[in-house]
Regions:
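Long, low-complexity, polar and repeat-rich extracellular regions
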Residues: 1-167
């Protein structure tokens, strides 16, 4: 797993890079920075899939029209950070769709205009707890958050005009 992550890290600093990843196991530490426009980390047809406990995942996309699509099937005691800087990016997260995400923490930060986030947590009957922080700065952003877990906590900081927040 470490060798794969290292090879990804050397190639993510150019525009139009596509990353597809499937990881299962305990203790994953993953950091990806994509700089440039039209980058992808997964797609709606081929999502990144993460499953395990004690994962630390930090994904940053800097530039316009970037895409991220991830399924985090199970992730107890895990921490995810997603930062997007630029306009017209699109991110989709399905968290806890098939397992527990107890003690999980998700931080989302968007700076720019016309960003779309779809975040669904806890569709599995076994999903519990969740702590989400959403920071949105810019105009015309569309944030859709659904949390179906016991003990879900969402915190918001939103600034800018014409932002659409649905929970």
């Amino acid at each position: 797993s470490s060798i794969f992550i290292l090879s990804v890290s050397t190639s993510v600093y150019t525009a139009d890079s596509d990353i597809y990843l499937t990881q299962t196991g305990t203790g994953l530490t993953l950091a990806i920075d994509q700089v440039g426009a039209s980058n992808k980390i997964g797609t709606s047809q081929a999502r990144v899939i993460l499953s395990g406990t004690s994962m630390t995942v930090d994904l940053d996309q800097l530039g316009d029209t970037n895409v991220l699509a991830a399924s985090i099937s199970q992730g107890n005691s895990s921490s995810w950070t997603y930062k997007v800087t630029g306009d017209s990016s699109n991110a989709t997260f399905a968290v806890g769709g098939t397992g527990d995400v107890a003690g999980s923490d998700f931080d989302f930060e968007a700076t720019g205009d016309s960003t779309v986030l779809v975040f669904n947590q806890g569709d599995a009957a076994t999903s519990t707890s969740g702590d989400q922080d959403f920071v949105v700065t810019g105009a015309s952003n569309n944030i859709n958050v659904k949390c179906n877990v016991i003990g879900c906590k969402n915190e918001w900081a939103v600034s800018g005009n014409s932002n659409d927040i649905d929970t």
